[in-house]
């Protein structure tokens, strides 16, 4: 599915429902049409582009099987925009989707409907996260918190192309039951001559259950503490030494531990075969009792400060922006969940603490950052760190086989 076209106007916009959706006494303002309104042009272009490509894909029959060319294919569009939505979209931009048929197939295998995916990315602007990856990587979540949008480098895009066929085959063989990132789309956006690459994945954390503490674990102990700057954040990302120094454990019980480690071992062996390393286990902890207390405080505050009328029908803009009108969308919460409860088909990385756990918790655990190959740079970094810290030190830049073995051992020790 390769196309290269120039358009003077943007794609037709779809009407939205004008119904009001309430969440915790907040009101939404519905847009009659998709305006792709965002705080910066790059996000408006992302919303426009995903809306356009999903609409285009809906007209392409689903093939019986993917062909080798699908793993090299792309669709791209150049827009000279002088008429449509000038307040929100740049006058000129380009949008490229990589391997559209492959990512559509992956979304299907991960149980994600294209319409839901489109709605999540395009209904309201993505939200900036205070998380920041290496080399200034930027993270956003969709307004409903279902998906994570991450800026990546052109080298990451090249590595994704290198592994995509084997990754897809692995997902087919494990029926989507994996701790690996669920890659759902990869795009290049060009605004004012600047190219930005973005990858969309399923959110490891829940759209509904608050994460109270999080860790990025590699199984290495050299220089693996959160910085003072990181610790000052509302939700810092702690690291291996922080985890160990706190005496932290994840209380999942024997059976859940066995199942989790089997899945982890299979996933990590796959990464070692691809000569990939430097990945992490992202861990989020939801404290059920604390969440209940916070919920009560929110409700008490909401009663004290009922939403003020804005003079146009009593609607207020809420932090989620435009509401969904699809009954299956997560913000409508069609099912009731008690404290610490979740839908395992949605929160696929979630695991409850064992009943013998000292605290009632929900853990979210997944492998992240799998686009680092063991290349010449990594070999050089390993040599330098070995000289500095000694051959026996638990440095992070070891070879992929050593890395996977150490990673598995560390994760086995933190689960109980």
Curated annotation (Swiss-Prot):
Entry-annotated residues carrying N6-acetyllysine: 94, 150
Sequence segments annotated as region (Required for interaction with PIP5K1A): 64-70
Give the Phosphoserine positions (modified residues): 19, 326
InterPro entries associated with the record: PInositol-4-P-4/5-kinase_C_sf (IPR027483), PInositol-4-P-4/5-kinase_core (IPR002498), PInositol-4-P-5-kinase_N (IPR027484), PInositol-4/5-P-5/4-kinase (IPR023610)
Where does the record place the modification Phosphothreonine? 8, 322
Matching entries from Gene3D superfamilies are given as:
2-Layer Sandwich, Phosphatidylinositol Phosphate Kinase II Beta
Q: Where does GTP bind?
A: 203-204, 214, 369
UniProt source species: Homo sapiens
Q: What Enzyme Commission number(s) apply to this enzyme?
A: 2.7.1.149
What is the name of the gene encoding this protein? Answer: PIP4K2B
Q: What is this protein called?
A: Phosphatidylinositol 5-phosphate 4-kinase type-2 beta
- Gene Ontology MF terms: 1-phosphatidylinositol-4-phosphate 5-kinase activity; 1-phosphatidylinositol-5-phosphate 4-kinase activity; ATP binding; GTP binding; protein homodimerization activity
Q: Which SUPFAM superfamilies does UniProt cross-reference here?
A: SAICAR synthase-like
> What are the subcellular locations of this protein?
Endoplasmic reticulum membrane; Cell membrane; Nucleus; Cytoplasm
Binding sites annotated in the UniProt record for ATP: 202-204, 214
* Quaternary state and interactors: Homodimer. Binds TNFRSF1A. Interacts with PIP4K2A; the interaction suppresses ubiquitination by the SPOP/CUL3 complex.
Q: Which residues carry this modification: N-acetylserine?
A: 2
Q: Post-translational modification, briefly? A: Ubiquitinated by the SPOP/CUL3 complex. Ubiquitination is stimulated by PtdIns5P levels. Phosphorylated on serine residues.
Q: Which UniProt keywords apply?
A: Acetylation, ATP-binding, Cell membrane, Cytoplasm, Endoplasmic reticulum, GTP-binding, Kinase, Lipid metabolism, Membrane, Nucleotide-binding, Nucleus, Phosphoprotein, Transferase, Ubl conjugation
Q: Which GO terms describe its cellular component?
A: autophagosome; cytosol; endoplasmic reticulum membrane; nucleoplasm; nucleus; plasma membrane
Q: Domain PIPK: where?
A: 38-415
Please report the record's description of how this protein sits within the membrane: Peripheral membrane protein
Catalytic activity reads: a 1,2-diacyl-sn-glycero-3-phospho-(1D-myo-inositol-5-phosphate) + ATP = a 1,2-diacyl-sn-glycero-3-phospho-(1D-myo-inositol-4,5-bisphosphate) + ADP + H(+); 1,2-dihexadecanoyl-sn-glycero-3-phospho-(1D-myo-inositol-5-phosphate) + ATP = 1,2-dihexadecanoyl-sn-glycero-3-phospho-(1D-myo-inositol-4,5-bisphosphate) + ADP + H(+); 1,2-dihexadecanoyl-sn-glycero-3-phospho-(1D-myo-inositol-5-phosphate) + GTP = 1,2-dihexadecanoyl-sn-glycero-3-phospho-(1D-myo-inositol-4,5-bisphosphate) + GDP + H(+)
Query: Which EC class is the enzyme in?
Result: transferase
Its biological purpose is as follows: Participates in the biosynthesis of phosphatidylinositol 4,5-bisphosphate. Preferentially utilizes GTP, rather than ATP, for PI(5)P phosphorylation and its activity reflects changes in direct proportion to the physiological GTP concentration. Its GTP-sensing activity is critical for metabolic adaptation. PIP4Ks negatively regulate insulin signaling through a catalytic-independent mechanism. They interact with PIP5Ks and suppress PIP5K-mediated PtdIns(4,5)P2 synthesis and insulin-dependent conversion to PtdIns(3,4,5)P3.
Q: Which GO terms describe its biological process?
A: 1-phosphatidyl-1D-myo-inositol 4,5-bisphosphate biosynthetic process; autophagosome-lysosome fusion; cell surface receptor signaling pathway; negative regulation of insulin receptor signaling pathway; phosphatidylinositol phosphate biosynthetic process; positive regulation of autophagosome assembly; regulation of autophagy
